[in-house]
Structures are given as structure tokens and as C-alpha cells.
Amino acid sequence: MKKMLKALGILLLVVVLAAAGLILWLSVTEFKPAPVENVEVSAVGALDQVDPEEELQILSWNIGYAGLGAGSDFFMDGGKDVRSADREQVLAYLAGIKSSIQTLDPDVVMLQEVDLDSGRTYRINEAAYLALDASAHAMNYACDFVPFPLPPLGRIYSGVFTTTQGLAIDEAERISLPCPFQWPVRTANIKRCLLASYLPIEGSDKYLVAVNLHLEAYDSGEGKIAQTRMLKEFIEGEYAKGNYVIAGGDFNQIFPGGLETYPNTHPEIWIPGLLEEDMLAEGWRFAYDLSVPSCRLLNQPYDPADTENTQYYVIDGFILSPNVELLSVEGVDLDFADSDHNPVLTSVKLK
């Protein structure tokens, strides 16, 4: 009996020391970005400035790191899988995503959950695969080993990615957003950010500022509120400089009217925040489409016939500054074939 207790004690000590060592290592190697960082812009050849007289098409799409297509579920959404796509499936999803972008033919593409070097996507550089003419990537998840759940997520290097077709990006910045998580959970968690890309405008010293965002998903709600407040302060500051601002991405908050269109029948799994029209300053506006859901719950593989368990949301869209005219906005129904989100395409013109 004493030998058994001694063995259990030694085993417990080993487990405690291993856990302490892991937490120490994660703390030392934690991704700690500065409040504002310059982001490298890669470009191919001579590119154009934005023509203020021409219509501009902008696409926002959370691509789910090309690992969350129609056949996927996810443990954080009430599903079972941690990694539901093998390498061939990731490549197939990526090919489908690229094909859809080429078909939609936007001028500016703002993507979320784009992996650079992650175990879950077999170290494929998705940004390089999807890049058009000028591109910038801002990291929001950088961890050599994410120890949860079981099996663990492992290595993740991922973020938001903006790429343009034929248009120049003069510079880009990563703006850190408040992190709602405390130590030690924070050490292996997402560090949300804005990616602001500055596109020059013909005949002007002002910029079109394309702000790519992916706000908090799995917090108590306070994180989303703080991040939305900071987003609002940033875009209003850019507008005050005379710039034109389009903020787009995955807000993880339901756009006005979205809850009535797609009631949340699974609040025990996930309750997204709510965006209110009156949160915007005078002249600013949302651009979103309620006719097509922009996201599905990953509690199971996609089955639109299962109306009881299939949950939809409209949490992806845009915010436009008063000097940007909204011409149209369309949720593009791709049946969640290659991602758990559908893309949203807006057409605008500078005033």
C-alpha cells in the first residue's frame, strides 16, 4: 500500500512539475505585440491608386483557416473535432476559397483566420497562396504550442490578411486590441488586432483606410465590447484626419435585425454580442446583408436539412465612414462549402 501511495505521489509530482514547466515556458515565449506595429507590405509590380470616380468592390471573409468547411464541426462550438481536415482537405478548401475570390473579382480582399505556419493546416502558408498584388498580414495568434484541448491544438501562427487586386498599399499597421483573458490562459490565446492598410487616392494626399478585423468570440462579452469601443475610436480618428474608412471583418456580434432573422436557438453553446445602429457616430453606417447568413454554428457538419440543429448568424460585414457611399452589399451564399463563414461583398464609392 505504501509503495502504491509513493508511486502515486511521484506521479502527481511529475504531473505538477510538467504543468508548471509548461506554464513557465508559455509565459516566457508569450506573444506580446506592441500597441502599434508596422506591417510589411508585399507588392508585385507598379500598382494603381484608388480612383475616386470609380466604384470599388471590397470583400470580407473569415476563411476558417481552410479547415472548417461543410464537413467540419469544432469543439468550441459544441462539436467534437479539434482538427477535422487532413492536408488534402485543407488544400481542397484553399483551392475553393481562391476560386471563389477569383470569381467575385473584388478590388480589396479582407480575410480573417489566415494561417502562416500552423500545425492544424500542415504548415501551409495560406497568405502566400491567396495573395493578389499588394498584401499585408497581421498576426493575432502566435504560439508554438497551444496545450488545449485533448488532443491539443499545437502550433498556431495565424492572423488577418488584406490583399488587393491592382491597387497599391502605401503602408500597413497592426493595432493591438484589448485582450480579455488573464494569465495563464492568456499565454496561449489569441491577441486580437486591427490591420489598417493605407491605400493612396488619385489626386489626394488622403488615404482609403481598409481596416481588417476579427473581434473576440469566446469571452464573457466584455472583450467584444472593449474591442468594439477601440475599433470605433480608431476609425473615427482616421476619419478626423480626412481619410476614407472602410472597416470590415468578423465582428462576432450580430448586426441589427440579425437576431430576428436568425433567432439564436442554441444559446447554451454560444451567445454572440449585438451591434446596435446607435453605436455609430452621425453619418457612419453599417453595411451587411440579412438575406444570406454569414456564419454557421460548428456544432455539427453542415446539414441545412437539419433545421433544428443548424444555427445561422449574420456577424460579418462593414462599417463605412460618412465620406464613403454605399452602393450595394451582398452576402454570397456558398453553402459554407469551404469555410464556416460566407463572404460578404460590398460596392462603394468615395464621396
Segments and roles (model prediction):
Residues Q57-I63, Y93-R123, S197, Y207-L213, ...:
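Active-site beta-strand/loop signature of hydrolases that rely on acidic residues for catalysis
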Residues K80-R87, V114-L116, L177-R186, L213-E222:
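Surface-exposed cleft-lining segments at the edges of enzyme active sites
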Residues L47-I58, G67-A70, I156, T163-D170, ...:
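Beta-strand-turn-beta hairpins that frame and shape the catalytic cleft
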Residues F145-F148, I175-Q182, L215-A217, V332-A337:
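Short, solvent-exposed aromatic-acidic interface loops
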Residues K3-D133, Y141-P152, K351:
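N-terminal, active-site-proximal structural segment of metallo-dependent hydrolase catalytic domains
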Residues W61-G64, Q112-V114, A142-F145, T164-G166, ...:
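Active-site-proximal beta-strand/loop segments in catalytic clefts of secreted hydrolases
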Residues Y122, H137-T162, T187, E222, ...:
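Active site of divalent-metal-dependent phosphoester/diester hydrolases
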Residues R87-L94, K224, T228, E308:
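A conditional alpha-helix N-cap/helix-loop micro-motif detector
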